[in-house]
A protein has these predicted regions:
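Acidic (Asp/Glu) and glycine-rich low-complexity loops/linkers
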Residues: 19-128, 136-147, 155-162, 174-176, ...
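Detector for intrinsically disordered, low-structure N-terminal pre-sequences
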Residues: 11, 143-145, 202, 214-215
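Bacterial Sec-dependent N-terminal signal peptides
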Residues: 1-28
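Calcium-binding motifs, dominated by EF-hand helix-loop-helix domains
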Residues: 106, 127, 146, 165, ...
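Thr-biased low-complexity repeat/linker tracts and other Thr-enriched repetitive architectures
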Residues: 130-132, 149-151, 168-170
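Short, surface-exposed interaction patches in beta-rich subdomains
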Residues: 158-162, 173-279
Length: 279
């Protein structure tokens, strides 16, 4: 058995070494894109960083991978990807793009990443993450839509009138939120670690998904005036509310709250419960 494990480990290391060797040494290339864009689509595990110190798009990749890098503008969309049926062969794919105040939509897939210290600002901001992609940025808008799947992660504060969060497949979001309306839909073991203040909170949690417990100054960190919605499949939520809570819980789900909210009209079945806590 030990011999088999040794052989397997050797083969894995050889394969990784071969991939890195095939990718070649890192090289950098500039891409000039004419015209503005409002949408960014990134695929194939590119790591994108926004900078105000550059005026062209700069890509770093293995010298044998670089010919397969595609940076193109289609209409209002900037798309960064590899050519179809090609591979990075173990090469890190890094991109630096100039700061663009007009950017209002970010779409990441295939374990891609987006990093910006400047924030997205507009009337409506859309963020779509799939395939274990990661987003690091603050968002300011009238309306914000975040759609995440496949163990993707979002790290950043959101300030908007309306926020719609839809997470599935063990995705995670973490940040400070300020909104008039916050709609949270979590499924498939997804988690939201949120702090902040919202007027209207709607929760739809299923499949062991959670609004994670976070305590600030002897209360739960996510504050709302009113909360309604459904929770099922062993999901948990922790909120602070001084207004009203009207929820339907099933399948061993639990809603924990601090504050003086009235829970009249709520319904709990299947071992579910609403708990008034004092952290």
């Amino acid at each position: 058995m030990r011999k088999q494990l040794f052989i397997l480990s050797t083969l894995v290391l050889f394969a990784l070494g071969s991939c890195q060797k095939y990718a070649g040494d890192p090289v950098t290339q500039d891409f000039n894109i004419e015209g503005s864009y409002t949408e960014l689509q990134v695929e194939n595990a590119f790591e994108v960083t926004v900078s105000d110190a550059v005026d062209v798009i700069t890509v770093t990749a293995g010298e044998n991978v670089m010919p397969n890098v595609v940076v193109e503008k289609i209409g209002n969309k900037l798309r960064i990807r590899l050519k179809t049926l090609t591979s990075a062969y173990g090469s890190d794919l890094k991109v630096v793009i100039p700061y663009n105040a007009d950017l209002t939509s970010v779409d990441l897939s295939d374990a891609s990443e987006f990093h910006s210290e400047y924030g997205l600002d507009g009337q409506k901001i859309e963020v779509e993450l799939s395939g274990a992609s990661e987003f690091y940025c603050e968002v300011y808008a009238d309306e914000v839509d975040v759609d995440m799947s496949g163990a993707s992660e979002f790290f950043g504060d959101i300030d908007a009138d309306e926020i719609d969060l839809d997470l599935s497949g063990a995705s995670k979001i973490e940040g400070y939120v300020t909104a008039t309306e916050l709609d949270i839909e979590l499924s498939g073991g997804s988690d939201a670690t949120l702090e902040g203040q919202v007027a209207e909170l709607e929760v739809n949690l299923s499949g062991a998904s959670n609004i994670i417990e976070k305590v600030v100054e002897h209360r739960y960190a996510l504050i709302c005036d009113h909360c309604e919605g459904t929770m099922s499949g062993g999901s948990d939520a922790y909120i602070h509310c001084d207004g009203s809570i009207k929820v339907s819980l099933s399948g061993g789900s639990e809603l924990h709250y601090t504050g003086n909210a009235a829970t009249t009209g709520s319904d709990c079945t299947g071992g579910s419960a609403i708990s008034h806590d004092v952290p």
